Curated annotation (Swiss-Prot):
UniProt KW Signal keyword: no
Subcellular location, principal: membrane
Gene behind this protein: nikB
Lineage: Bacteria, Bacillati, Bacillota, Bacilli, Bacillales
Record protein name field: Nickel import system permease protein NikB
Family annotation (Pfam families): BPD_transp_1 (PF00528), BPD_transp_1_N (PF19300)
InterPro entries, A to Z: BPD_transp_1_N, MetI-like, MetI-like_sf, Opp2B
Length: 328
């Protein structure tokens, strides 16, 4: 019962946040410089008749009050109608559908690559605590966090195009961006896995398993793997949302026709309907992914369910992630 209430509460939070994002997007577009009528007519206002300008404003609903315009905006949004591009005259929804797949492909590929690399490295670092393997992994993780993604991307582009003379679309528009985005994400996951595993290795469950004569592989798989990975789920939600936002820079650096590239191109041409669509897509995606991550954590983590069932234990039942800094 408590789980259902908590899930409903998180879903309500998501709806409220999406509503706020939509309203803020509407306000920001209204405060942005320039007149959409000028952009649509593609002419200087002095060369256009007053009747033509008023007719265009009536068609766009610009003569209505802001409250009425907002109401129409929200109503159209609920029907997935984001208007038409000033430049191409295509529906914004269709444009987003054309550009979104490559962005989502790069983001989810980055997530998979990061998990496949960081979880084993985090386990190795914890099992070889304070040995040279652990130190090397920690140094590489620190460097990956310290260097900006665009700087890593520039270095990779220079190595591949100038030093290796490789000209490949798949390499430059998919493999290199995934590597660039994965490095920073891997570093955070490695540190989290390492810290959680170091703490769990000192737990009573592990000590009891060792006393029963269980080997280290059995203990790792049956006793440690699940509680080590569970705290990663909220981090993945945050990271995946950040990846979508981070693609704005990476897609323009690698010339990838995704949402980030579309957003920058629309800002340059002041194509406001497309800008609104891109901002809403990124905002909605981040909120929905984080909500899904919270719900998965709630369903899979027994400590979360215990805290919901007995709120008095909330301060007395520490989560794994709270003690992670001790071994960082």
């Amino acid at each position: 019962m408590f789980i259902i209430k908590s899930m409903l509460y998180r879903l309500m939070q998501m709806i409220v946040v999406l509503f706020v994002i939509s309203t803020l997007t509407f306000i920001l577009m209204k405060l942005s410089p320039g007149n959409p009528v000028d952009k649509i007519l593609h002419l200087d206002v002095a060369q256009v008749s007053t009747e033509q300008i008023n007719a265009t404003k009536d068609k766009l609903g610009l003569n209505d009050s802001l409250l009425v315009q907002w109401w129409h905006w929200m109503n159209h949004l609920l029907h997935f109608n984001l208007g038409k591009s000033f430049e191409s005259k295509e529906p914004v929804t269709q444009i987003l559908f054309n550009y979104a797949p490559i962005t989502l492909l790069i983001s989810f590929s980055t997530l998979v690559v990061s998990l496949c690399i960081s979880i084993p490295l985090g386990i190795i670092a914890a099992k070889r605590f304070h040995k040279w393997t652990d130190k090397v992994i920690r140094v590489i993780s620190t460097l990956s966090i310290s260097l900006p993604a665009f700087f890593i991307g520039i270095i990779l582009l220079f190595i591949v195009t100038n030093l290796m003379n490789i000209d490949s679309v798949i390499l430059s528009q998919f493999i290199l961006p995934v590597i660039t985005l994965s490095l920073g994400m891997c570093a955070y996951i490695i540190r989290l896995v390492r810290s959680n595993l170091l703490m769990l290795l000192q737990s009573n469950i592990v000590q009891a398993s060792r006393l029963r004569g269980m080997n280290e592989r059995y203990i790792l798989i049956h006793d440690l793997l699940k509680p080590t990975i569970l705290p990663i789920i909220p981090l993945l939600g945050i990271s995946l949302g950040s990846l979508i936002g981070g693609t704005v820079v990476i897609e323009n650096l690698f010339d990838i026709p995704g949402i980030g590239y579309l957003l920058m191109d629309s800002i340059k041409s002041r194509d406001y309907p497309v800008i609104q669509g891109c901002v809403l897509f990124i905002g909605f995606f981040v909120v929905i992914i984080n909500t899904i991550a919270d719900l998965l954590t709630l369903l899979l983590d027994p400590k979360q369910r215990l805290q919901l069932g007995n709120p008095k234990n909330k301060t007395n039942t520490p989560l794994i992630s709270e003690s992670s800094d001790r071994h960082a």
